Amino acid sequence: MIMPFHLAGMSLPISPKLPGLLRSVVREQRLDLNNLSTLTFNFRSPDYSAETGGVHPVELRLIRGLHGWVFDYITDFSYQGLGQDAELCKELDFNLSCDEHYLQGWGPLPGVEARELFALWQSNFISYAQLGYFTVTVSGE
């Protein structure tokens, strides 16, 4: 199964390892991509909780374009609040399709800051995934 990605013109620096990771997930889950136009990947660490912290959950969405799969958004979630009032909220939101990026507590991020933060986040995320911290579910439409 071939899963081409179209990365030209992306506002953030996508490492070749990230599409490789997503291809591996699709292959492992034996997904049939023929009739799908979107894929949503949910990466969850079973040990992550409001009390103990841990590796944040991540949602990543791809859209099928004319020249391959394109990144729509990548969102990193974290628990905010204390005790029973803690709720899972967006901490980092990289909207690649519209070049708008957000960090909780800071608000919208200018391009240079977004690129630097994304490069660091992406490196950590790929490392955590390769180390097996996540269970992954994929849904498609």
Region annotations inferred by a language model:
Residues 22, 26-30, 34, 78, ...:
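Generic secondary-structure transition motif, activating predominantly at the C-termini of alpha-helices
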Residues 1-46, 132-140:
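N-terminal domain-onset segments
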Residues 6, 29-31, 46-50, 82-84, ...:
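Short, flexible coil/linker segments at or flanking structured domains
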Residues 100-141:
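Low-complexity intrinsically disordered segments
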Residues 3, 39-41, 69, 75, ...:
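Short non-domain terminal segments
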Residues 43-45, 62-64, 76, 96-98, ...:
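Surface-exposed beta-strand edges and flanking loops
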Residues 30-69:
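Amphipathic, interaction-prone secondary-structure segments
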Residues 66-116:
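An exposed acidic His-Trp-rich patch
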